[in-house]
């Protein structure tokens, strides 16, 4: 992948410093999906166009078997944090975290082409951040580097209200 074609990330040095701090001290941000829930609640009983981005760590099952649980959990924390931050930078919402994956929504209510572009650009930046910021820090600590798979699709969904039990 030609990184010169990718949109610029504001400050890779700051991203790498945050990754380093997360490896040392744990997650540095709120990883809740509350903003996505608010987005969906405002659209209860409406059909909403979205682009769905699915991002996961390639080979994570083997990695989870080879690493001590605390090391694997730390890698998942870094991955989840950095992918979540990039998602929000591109106007997306994290719908949920599923093991080693993140499912994100990009609203396509007004411009599905722009939503698709945002999701694709987000995926490109995710690849770049993994390659240029996350992997050097992991390798420096004797941990395996990550390869990330990204897939997207466009959908119409209907948000419905679910009563709390």
List PLM regions with ranges.
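Juxtacatalytic helix/coil linker segments
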Residues: 1-90
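Surface-exposed beta-strand edges and their flanking turn/coil or helix-capping segments
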Residues: 65-66, 118-119, 165
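Non-membrane alpha-helical structural segments and their capping/turn regions in soluble enzymes
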Residues: 73, 77, 113-120
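Catalytic core of nucleotidyl cyclases, primarily class III adenylyl/guanylyl cyclases
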Residues: 90-115, 134-165
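Serine endopeptidase catalytic core focused on the charge-relay Asp
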Residues: 126
């Amino acid at each position: 992948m030609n990184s010169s074609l990718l949109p610029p990330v504001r400050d890779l040095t700051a991203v790498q410093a945050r990754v380093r701090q997360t490896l040392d001290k744990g997650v540095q941000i709120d990883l809740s999906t509350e903003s996505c829930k608010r987005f969906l609640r405002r659209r209860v009983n409406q059909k909403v166009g979205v682009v769905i981005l699915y991002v996961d760590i390639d080979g994570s099952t083997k990695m989870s078997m080879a690493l001590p649980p605390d090391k694997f959990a730390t890698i998942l924390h870094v991955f989840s944090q950095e992918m979540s931050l990039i998602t929000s930078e591109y106007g997306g919402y994290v719908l949920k975290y599923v093991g080693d994956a993140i499912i994100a929504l990009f609203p396509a209510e007004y411009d599905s082409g722009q939503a698709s572009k945002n999701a694709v650009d987000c995926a490109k930046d995710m690849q770049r951040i993994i390659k240029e910021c996350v992997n050097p820090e992991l390798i420096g600590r004797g941990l395996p580097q990550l390869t990330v798979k990204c897939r997207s699709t466009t959908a119409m969904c209907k948000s419905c209200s679910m009563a709390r039990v």
